[in-house]
């Protein structure tokens, strides 16, 4: 299954690969082979990147799910992000080989949507949290609020977010993606207990990131 967020890119890559392979037919067979192999691999990688496997959210209450596939880069306490109280920052790094479809971490109402232009530093560089292009999102369920950001990276220069401010969203549902390598940063409220440590892997919509 492929994500609809990638249809336009997949079509463009397919047409480009087809054109290159067709143009290569003017060369001798020995010269055509590496060209066909290269375009074939490029097309296969594109299809692999835009895969969208089925995910089933845990049937549990008072949980916060990982919004992205990847590896935990950072778990850090910080002050003043949510109602002036101590919160926990959790950063997830997505390599180009991870599934890049993002999923809702908490059921509730979308209270914040803010696009912020910026740079395109490497996503594993913690400076990218403040400097890079990103979409800032907030979800409140009446008990807690979770803030998180889709952050562009050096390769990822296209953020897709289909959320609308004021809409109600369900835990584990798809809401967007970041194309070609990136990170997601979450700010969790004081009542949330993070269950993962740096270095551990996550699966969007399935891995329980925290409980509250």
Curated annotation (Swiss-Prot):
Cofactor(s) needed by this chain: pyruvate
MF terms (GO), sorted A to Z: phosphatidylserine decarboxylase activity
The EC number(s) this enzyme carries: 4.1.1.65
Membrane topology (UniProt): Peripheral membrane protein
Keyword match Transmembrane helix: no
Reaction equations catalysed: a 1,2-diacyl-sn-glycero-3-phospho-L-serine + H(+) = a 1,2-diacyl-sn-glycero-3-phosphoethanolamine + CO2
Keyword vocabulary terms for this entry: Cell membrane, Decarboxylase, Lipid biosynthesis, Lipid metabolism, Lyase, Membrane, Phospholipid biosynthesis, Phospholipid metabolism, Pyruvate, Zymogen
UniProt site positions, description: Cleavage (non-hydrolytic): 181-182
Gene Ontology cellular-component terms listed: plasma membrane
Pathway per the UniProt entry: Phospholipid metabolism; phosphatidylethanolamine biosynthesis; phosphatidylethanolamine from CDP-diacylglycerol: step 2/2
GO terms, biological process: phosphatidylethanolamine biosynthetic process
Subcellular location: Cell membrane
Domain of life: Bacteria
Coiled coil: none
Active site residues according to the UniProt entry: 182 (schiff-base intermediate with substrate)
Co-factor: note: Binds 1 pyruvoyl group covalently per subunit.
The UniProt record lists the keyword Transcription regulation: no
Modified residues (Pyruvic acid (Ser)): 182
Maturation and modification: Is synthesized initially as an inactive proenzyme. Formation of the active enzyme involves a self-maturation process in which the active site pyruvoyl group is generated from an internal serine residue via an autocatalytic post-translational modification. Two non-identical subunits are generated from the proenzyme in this reaction, and the pyruvate is formed at the N-terminus of the alpha chain, which is derived from the carboxyl end of the proenzyme.
Pfam families: PS_Dcarbxylase (PF02666)
NCBIfam families: PRK05305.1-2, PRK05305.2-2, PRK05305.2-5
Purpose of the protein: Catalyzes the formation of phosphatidylethanolamine (PtdEtn) from phosphatidylserine (PtdSer).
The family this protein is said to belong to: Belongs to the phosphatidylserine decarboxylase family. PSD-A subfamily.
Subunit composition and interactions: Heterodimer of a large membrane-associated beta subunit and a small pyruvoyl-containing alpha subunit.
Protein name (Swiss-Prot/TrEMBL): Phosphatidylserine decarboxylase proenzyme
């Amino acid at each position: 299954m492929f994500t609809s967020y990638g249809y336009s890119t997949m079509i463009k890559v397919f047409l480009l690969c087809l054109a290159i392979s067709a143009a290569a037919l003017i060369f001798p067979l020995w010269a055509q082979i590496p060209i066909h192999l290269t375009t074939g691999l490029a097309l296969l990688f594109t299809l692999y990147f835009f895969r969208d496997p089925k995910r089933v959210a845990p049937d549990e209450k008072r949980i916060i799910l990982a919004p992205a596939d990847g590896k935990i880069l950072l778990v850090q306490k910080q002050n003043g992000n949510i109602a002036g109280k101590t919160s926990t920052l959790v950063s997830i790094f997505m390599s180009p080989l991870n599934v890049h479809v993002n999923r809702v971490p908490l059921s509730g109402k979308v209270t914040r949507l803010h696009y912020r232009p910026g740079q395109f530093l490497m996503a594993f560089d913690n400076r990218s949290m403040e400097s890079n292009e990103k979409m800032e999102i907030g979800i409140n369920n009446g008990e807690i609020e979770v803030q998180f950001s889709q952050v562009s990276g050096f390769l990822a220069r296209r953020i897709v977010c289909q959320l609308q401010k004021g809409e109600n969203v369900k835990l584990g549902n798809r809401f967007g993606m970041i194309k070609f390598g990136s990170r997601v940063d979450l700010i969790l409220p004081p009542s949330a207990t993070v269950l993962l440590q740096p270095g551990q892997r996550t699966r969007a919509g399935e891995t329980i990131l925290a409980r509250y």
